[in-house]
């Protein structure tokens, strides 16, 4: 019984963040400049960046609120500019 409890606690911590949120920031090769947000796994915050418009990945959100909701960010610090 203790083993199962430990297993679920570890699983909860390990998988608490959506896997897409662990992807690196990808600006992409196109030349557009769309303001977007991505989850920075080092700072554990959603940060603003300019998306080029193509060949990005799933760690790319239209709003800070969407990024925080999907990636489980608890504190609402001001976003770090990149």
From Swiss-Prot:
- Give the intrachain disulfide bonds: 21-71, 30-54, 46-67
- Residues excised as propeptide: 76-82
Instruction: State a single Gene Ontology molecular function.
Output: potassium channel regulator activity
Stretches that traverse the bilayer: none
A Pfam family annotated for this UniProt entry:
Kunitz_BPTI
* Annotated signal peptide: 1-16
Residues the record marks as site: Reactive bond: 31-32
Q: Report the subcellular localization.
A: Secreted; Nematocyst
* Cellular component GO terms, alphabetical: extracellular region; nematocyst
Q: Could you tell me which InterPro entries the record lists for this protein?
A: Kunitz_BPTI (IPR002223), Kunitz_BPTI_sf (IPR036880), Prtase_inh_Kunz-CS (IPR020901), TFPI/VKTCI-like (IPR050098)
* Keyword Signal attached: yes
What are the record keywords, sorted?
Disulfide bond, Ion channel impairing toxin, Nematocyst, Potassium channel impairing toxin, Protease inhibitor, Secreted, Serine protease inhibitor, Signal, Toxin, Voltage-gated potassium channel impairing toxin
**Keyword Heme attached:** no
Extract the CDD domains matched here: Kunitz_actitoxin-like (cd22633)
What functional role does this protein have? Serine protease inhibitor that inhibits both tissue and plasma kallikreins. Has hemolytic activity. Inhibits voltage-gated potassium channels (Kv).
The name this protein goes by in its record = U-actitoxin-Avd3p
